[in-house]
Design a protein with these regions (language model features):
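Flanking helices and flexible, charged tails adjoining ferredoxin-like Fe-S electron-transfer domains
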Residues: 32-63, 94, 102-211
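Short, flexible active-site loops
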Residues: 86-89, 126
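Ferredoxin-type iron-sulfur electron-transfer modules and their immediate structural context
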Residues: 1-77, 81, 86, 94, ...
C-alpha cells in the first residue's frame, strides 16, 4: 500500500505543499491561471504552525481503514475507488455538507469548500485524495513533488516505516556515543530555518519578561 509519509522534524512551514495541492486540484492545473478560477481552488493539506517559530506540521487525511468519515456519511458520498482501494474519496455531487465526517475525523483534516463538481458550486466536504488522478497517470502526489526538504515522502508504507525505524535506531546509537551525530543532521537549510525560529522565539519570550 502506497501512502504519503510525513517527517514533521523536516517541515519548515513554507506551504509549497499547499500551493501545489491547490493547483493540482484546479481546473487549469496552472498556478497563474488557478488564482482567477471561480471557485478558487483550495489545498487539501495544511502546514500548521508549531509552538516554536519556523516549525510546522503538514496535516492531511490519513485514509484510515476503516474510515470513520465513511462510516457516518448518510449519503454514501465517501467511498473507496475500485482501482485505488487504499484511498478514501468524497463524491461532491452526493455530499450534503452535513458535517458528520468532519465531526468524527480524528485528525481534523476535512474542510468545506465550494466545488465546481457540486450542484450550484456549493460548499462540500473536501480532503486529500492522494492526488488519485496524478497517480492514475503514473505521477506522485503534488505535495510530495513540491516539498524541497524531504518532509513528505511517497511510497510503500512498510518501506517508509522501515526507513524511519532505521533512522530512530541510528539516533539511539548517537545518544550512546557509538557513532557520529553528523549522520543525523537535517539539511543545512532546515537546520538554519529552525535555529532562526528558535532564536526569535527566545527574543520574544525575553521581551515579554522585560529582559
Amino acid at each position: 500500500m502506497k501512502t504519503v509519509f510525513i517527517h514533521p522534524e523536516r517541515c519548515i512551514g513554507c506551504k509549497q505543499c499547499e500551493a501545489a495541492c491547490a493547483v493540482a486540484h484546479s481546473q487549469s492545473k496552472n498556478l497563474f491561471l488557478a488564482v482567477f478560477e471561480v471557485p478558487t481552488p483550495k489545498p487539501r493539506i495544511h502546514a500548521e504552525q508549531g509552538l516554536v517559530l519556523n516549525t510546522a506540521f503538514p496535516n492531511k487525511c490519513r485514509h484510515c481503514l476503516p474510515a470513520p468519515c465513511q462510516a457516518v456519511c448518510p449519503t454514501a458520498a465517501i467511498y473507496r475507488p475500485m482501482d485505488f482501494p487504499e484511498i478514501v474519496q468524497i463524491h461532491p455531487k452526493k455530499c450534503i455538507a452535513c458535517g458528520m465526517c468532519a465531526m468524527v475525523c480524528p485528525f481534523d483534516v476535512i474542510t468545506f469548500y465550494a466545488s465546481v463538481q457540486a450542484p450550484d458550486k456549493s460548499s462540500v466536504a473536501t480532503k486529500c485524495d492522494h492526488c488519485i488522478e496524478r497517480q492514475r497517470q503514473g505521477q506522485i502526489p503534488a505535495c510530495v513533488e513540491a516539498c524541497k526538504v524531504g518532509a513528505l515522502q511517497f511510497g510503500e508504507i512498510n518501506e517508509l516505516v522501515k526507513s524511519a525505524r532505521t533512522r530512530y535506531s541510528e539516533m539511539v546509537s548517537v545518544s550512546l556515543a557509538q557513532v557520529s551525530a553528523e549522520i543525523l543532521r537535517q539539511p543545512d537549510n532546515v537546520e538554519a530555518w529552525h535555529r532562526q525560529g528558535a532564536a526569535i522565539s527566545r527574543m520574544n519570550a525575553d521581551e515579554k519578561k522585560g529582559v
